[in-house]
């Protein structure tokens, strides 16, 4: 079985060093091919020599999204049985350190919160999650695994045709038979671009049991601290969802989730806004919690709307 882990980044090396360390483990200890693509020559030149010895590090200033180098090269794409596209968004996790092959104990400089030792070798953790994800795909389900960022497994016969309107999540749901069902379900909410909201599809599929989702850090920490923009199910299991996902899932499944304190608040959905996911994420500092109408949610976990609006954690 041949596997390629592909990453694209627009962040300086120091911001993604932790991820580079994980990728080096995958390459050195598991023999997995790793391809890291930089969009900036300045950042590309910052990468220490030892990482080039373990993985393929490319420079493509014209690339616009993760996987451009793969989807534009059918020879590379069809060479592997599985391609794992990993997001490089590690900026808020940069204080998590890797010590002697283990996730160590540190204090987040921005929040002052402790992170706790997990006492599990990182390499073993990565191997287990990747193997489990591939098994999920082989069983006909779509695997969505988070590892200090987002790592998702794609079917090898998927052809990326339009990065603005097609997502691997949607494609996988189509393959699993949930895509049409999800679209029909979401249309009742009158969203301007149903096809652009793969966060909806992911949450919907997860609730149906089709998506495997787990943040390694959240799943293994002995205490539920340090991850501000996430939600937790009433039964205590974690759902790795972004701030944007939280609003979607909250609206779709009242009572299924309870809020944790949000780092940047909530995103307001405005009719006619046609920038899709990226546009909403760019606006999330403006469209914060106070702008979103939470009163319509009938959620037993919300005891006081004003506390939610002020950013307090409501148990």
Stretches found by the model and what they are:
Residues 2-7, 23, 33-36:
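Hydrophobic targeting segments
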Residues 7-27:
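Short, well-formed alpha-helical segments that are part of the catalytic scaffolds
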Residues 15, 19, 193-315:
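C-terminal catalytic/acceptor-binding lobe
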Residues 38-80, 93-102:
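Active-site-proximal specificity loops/subdomain of glycosyltransferases
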Residues 80, 139-143, 210:
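Short, high-confidence coil segments that cap the C-terminus of an alpha-helix
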Residues 83:
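Short aromatic/hydrophobic "clamp" motif used to bind/position activated sugar donors
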Residues 88-92:
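Acidic metal-phosphate-binding loop of nucleotide-sugar-dependent transferases
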Residues 93-194:
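Conserved catalytic core of nucleotide-sugar-dependent glycosyltransferases
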């Amino acid at each position: 079985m041949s596997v390629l882990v592909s990453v694209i980044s627009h962040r300086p090396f120091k911001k993604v060093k932790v991820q580079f360390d994980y990728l080096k483990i995958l390459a050195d200890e598991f023999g997995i091919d790793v391809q890291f693509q930089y969009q900036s020559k300045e950042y590309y030149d910052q990468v220490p020599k030892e990482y080039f010895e373990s993985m393929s590090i490319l420079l493509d200033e014209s690339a616009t999204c993760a996987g451009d180098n793969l989807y534009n090269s059918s020879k590379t794409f069809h060479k592997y049985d599985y391609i794992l596209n990993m997001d490089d968004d590690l900026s808020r996790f940069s204080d998590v350190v890797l010590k002697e092959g283990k996730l160590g104990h540190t204090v987040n400089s921005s929040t002052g919160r402790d992170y706790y030792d997990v006492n599990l070798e990182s390499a073993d953790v990565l191997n287990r999650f990747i193997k489990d994800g591939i098994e999920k795909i082989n069983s006909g389900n779509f695997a969505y695994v988070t590892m200090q960022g987002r790592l998702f497994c794609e079917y090898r016969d998927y052809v990326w045709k339009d990065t603005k309107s097609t997502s691997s999540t949607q494609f996988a749901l189509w393959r699993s038979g949930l895509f049409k069902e999800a679209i029909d379900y979401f249309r009742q909410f009158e969203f301007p671009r149903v096809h652009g909201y793969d966060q909806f599809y992911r949450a919907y599929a997860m609730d149906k049991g089709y998506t495997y989702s787990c943040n390694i850090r959240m799943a293994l920490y002995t205490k539920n601290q340090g991850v501000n923009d996430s939600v937790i199910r009433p039964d205590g299991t974690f759902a790795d969802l972004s701030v944007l996902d939280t609003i979607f899932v909250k609206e779709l499944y009242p009572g299924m989730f309870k809020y944790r304190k949000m780092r940047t608040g909530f995103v307001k959905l405005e009719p006619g806004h046609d920038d899709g996911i990226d546009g909403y994420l760019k606006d999330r500092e403006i469209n914060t919690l106070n702008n979103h109408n939470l009163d319509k949610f009938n959620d037993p976990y919300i005891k006081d709307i004003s506390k939610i609006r002020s950013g307090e954690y409501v148990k």
